[in-house]
Amino acid sequence: ECLVTEGLKVKLQWASAFGHAHQRVAFGLELWKGILREHPEIKAPFSRVRGDNIYSPQFGAHSQRVLSGLDITISMLDTPDMLAAQLAHLKVQHVERNLKPEFFDIFLKHLLHVLGDRLGTHFDFGAWHDCVDQIIDGIKDI
């Protein structure tokens, strides 16, 4: 469960880690490099957006769509009704793409790794795990 105080901390830490403009592109590259290096099988579901080349404009745009979706959901952590509606919308999109539930767990693992690298000693792993678990559980088709 993502407590109110955890949600507020996650929002603040996300703003710091995700940054602005080019920092967001770099965040996406770091995240997807780790995911695809350890799990090359994940490239296949992303063939439509050039999952074979994370430096392509198509994959860069996809990366920013994913991270913007995460950004929106994080911004709604303190508005449960809005968050529930957003998660329902995202779930439909992800179910249509037939993404395996374990892909979400892989995403979470790598997201937490990148956040830890960027936030250092300020990173609250527990708060992030609780809040992003809530987001992911609302999206993935279990």
UniProtKB/Swiss-Prot annotation:
Instruction: Give the intrachain disulfide bonds.
Output: C2-C131
Q: Which GO terms describe its cellular component?
A: extracellular region; hemoglobin complex
Disulfide bond recorded as keyword = yes
SUPFAM superfamilies the record matches:
Globin-like (SSF46458)
A Pfam match = Globin
Which source organism does the UniProt entry give? Lumbricus terrestris (Common earthworm)
Name recorded for this polypeptide: Extracellular globin-1
- Give all residue intervals belonging to the Globin domain: 1-142
